[in-house]
Amino acid sequence: MEAKAYLNMIRISPRKVRLVADTIRNKPVAAAIATLYNLDKRSAEPVLKLLNSAIANAVNNNGMDADKLFVKTIFVNEGPTLKRFRPRAHGRAYEILKRTSHVTIIVSDERI
């Protein structure tokens, strides 16, 4: 059985969030929590909260055992990009792209 959790519009670049997502993919949730807790990345905290939400969904909604769960799937998609302009010399302006991410995590109690 599976449980899902979503995190939308996180204001961190998808490329940076994917670094964290790759470290916890296919791990047991206890090992994934320990990894995220000790990881020195800005995106580790939101992904840790998302993982805890997925675990809570599995336990409360589906009645699964939290000790048997593992991270089956985690993927990061690109969200909408906020466009800002920075003034530059001689009346020019450069476009600054503020990228956002959508993160989806699926935990399961069935090993493949």
UniProtKB/Swiss-Prot annotation:
UniProt-listed CDD domains: Ribosomal_L22 (cd00336)
Quaternary structure and partners: Part of the 50S ribosomal subunit.
Q: Which GO terms describe its biological process?
A: translation
Query: What PROSITE patterns does UniProt report for this protein, alphabetically?
Result: RIBOSOMAL_L22
What biological function has been recorded for the protein in this entry? This protein binds specifically to 23S rRNA; its binding is stimulated by other ribosomal proteins, e.g. L4, L17, and L20. It is important during the early stages of 50S assembly. It makes multiple contacts with different domains of the 23S rRNA in the assembled 50S subunit and ribosome.
Protein name in the entry:
Large ribosomal subunit protein uL22
Task: Name which cysteines form disulfide bonds.
Answer: none
